[in-house]
Amino acid sequence: MNLPNFIIGGGVATGTSFLSHAIRDHSEIYLPKVMRPECGFFYKSWEYSKGLEYYSNKWFADAGEQKTKGERSSLYLHGDFLRVAERIHKHIPNIKLIFCLRNPTERAYANYRFSVLSGYEKFSFEKALSREDKRFAQAKGWKKEIQPNLYRRRGLYDVQLRPFLDFFPKENIHLIKSESLSANTELEIKKLFDFLGVEFQNYNLAQKFTSYSVKSRILQTQLRKFYGEKLTKVTENARQVSYENSIADKIVNWNLLNEKIPMTDSVRSHLNEYYAESNQFVSKITGWDLTDWA
C-alpha cells in the first residue's frame, strides 16, 4: 500500500498552495495531482471512515519510485478539535510534517476574504469575528468539521501545534514562516529539501493573481448555491481571462472587485492582542523574530 512519508498540513491561507506548486516537479518527490477539494483524509470523518486502503488508492495510486511521497491538506493544522494529529500518528507514525505559519492577523483576514469569494460568508469581517464562537458551536453537517467561517481560532498556533508536538518528535516537524517563504523563497525551499532528504533542484514559482474582493457578499452566497463546488473554478477563470459563457458567468464577473479592501485598524488591534500569547509560543519553539507579526 502506497502511503505518504510527508504531509504539507497547513495552515489555511499561509502559502501551502505556493509551496506545493514549487516542489511538485522535483524528480524525487511525488505529490498527487491538484484536486478540489483537497485530500483532507485525516480531517474529514466521512473520508477517514473509508479506511487507509481507500486513501492510498485515491491519492497515491499513480506514485512511482520517487524517493519521497506526500500530500497537501491545509486543514490538518487546524484539526485539534478532531484529533487529526492522533489519527495521522496511528497510521503513519514516522511521517514528516510541514506547516506554514503566517502572521495570524493577516491569515485570519485572508481566510475571511477567501470564504467571501467562495460564497460562504455574508457578514462583514468584524461581525463574522463576533459571531465566530457561536457559529463554531452551532455548525451542522459538513460545516461542523470544515468550519468555513472559522477565522480567528485558526491563528492560535500554540493550540494547534501542541497535539502534533505531543505525538511526533520535533525533528519530524518542519515549520516555515510564510513571510520568509515569500521574501526568501530559495532559502526556504533549500531547507525544505534538506528536511525531506532530497537534493536541491530548480523549483516552480506559481503565477500570482490579483487579490479580488466582491461587490456583494449576499450575491456571492447566492452564486455558491447556483454553482456549488464549481463556483471556485468559475471565479478562478474570471480572474485569469475574460470568461463569460453564460449570464450567470457574467454575474460572477460583475460581482468581482479588482482590489483588496483593507482591514480596519480596530479589528487589527483586537487580533494582534488576541494572538500575542500564541505568538510568544511560536517564537519560543522556533527562535523566529516575530516583531513583524505585532
Question: What do these predicted regions represent?
Answer:
Residues 1-77, 91-95, 104-141, 168:
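PAPS-dependent sulfotransferase catalytic core
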Residues 15-16, 70, 88, 97, ...:
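Generic structural signal for small/hydrophobic residues in well-ordered secondary structure
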Residues 35-37, 162-273, 287-288, 293-294:
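The conserved 3'-phosphoadenosine-5'-phosphosulfate
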Residues 44-50, 76-82, 152, 180-184:
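Acidic-and-aromatic substrate-binding clefts and catalytic sites of carbohydrate-active enzymes
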Residues 52-61, 121-205:
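PAPS-dependent sulfotransferase catalytic domain
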Residues 80-99:
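ATP-dependent NMP and nucleoside kinases share a basic, alpha-helical "lid"
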Residues 82, 108-113, 119-120, 187-189, ...:
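Short aromatic-enriched loop/helix-cap "lid" or pocket-rim segments at secondary-structure transitions
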